[in-house]
Structures are given as structure tokens and as C-alpha cells.
């Protein structure tokens, strides 16, 4: 079991964002904002809630694992044979927030999914930053 876990890979994206954690949290948890930078979904920040991200190519089945408002959010991510966990961590800094996104659970035989996530999450986090900047109704 320990060997299997050691073989799993993780995609990590980190950014310093010039907004408070509350504003970033809003973009991570409000479906109308999630749709702008990630995908449409029926997400709600409630532990054990099952939800689906929907894209033109298919869907991603998810379940909320952890919710610490304005600090951390974690959910499963299941699509096309990939069973992984996405974790968002928000740490306040003097200039805003340090955002860290990790997707853990890529097996060695899932190279295409791993590389796709490496590229895709970077793009999604860039879009997330744009949505945060444009969200005038937030903190």
C-alpha cells in the first residue's frame, strides 16, 4: 500500500495573488464564478456533497472532502479512469494571498492525464485570477 502511494504523482500550481483569501474563496466556491474559470457545476462547499463539473468533452464526478472557509478546500476528482484529489490552500500574506492547488493521484500509466493536468491547471489558475480581478461584488 505504501509503495502504491509513493508511485502516485501530484500536479501543483502556486501563485501569489493580490487579493484577500475571502475574495479567492468566493471564486473557488460560487458556481456562477466557477463556471467562468473552470466548468459549470452544481458545487456547494459542504463536506460529503457530491457534485459534477460538466464540460464539452464529458464530466467530472466529485465529492467534497474538506471545507475550511477562506483557508482550504478539498474534493475528489474522478474522470476518464482518474481518481484523484484536488486541494486548494489559501494563506494570507502581506500583499494578498498565497494560493496553492494540488491534484494528487496520477499513476505512472496516466502520463497523458498528468501532462494534461499540468498544462490545464496552470491555465485555469490564470483564468481564476482574471475572474477574481473582475468580481467587483466580492470583498
Language-model features: where?
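Hydrophobic-ligand binding "helix-grip"
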Residues: 39-43, 52-100, 104-107
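A conserved amphipathic terminal alpha-helix motif
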Residues: 105-139
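Residues at helix-coil transition
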Residues: 29-30, 39, 69, 126, ...
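Hydrophobic ligand-binding cavity/cleft-lining segments
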Residues: 1-42
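Hydrophobic pocket/interface hotspot
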Residues: 24, 34, 51, 64, ...
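A generic structural micro-feature
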Residues: 5-9, 56, 80-82, 113
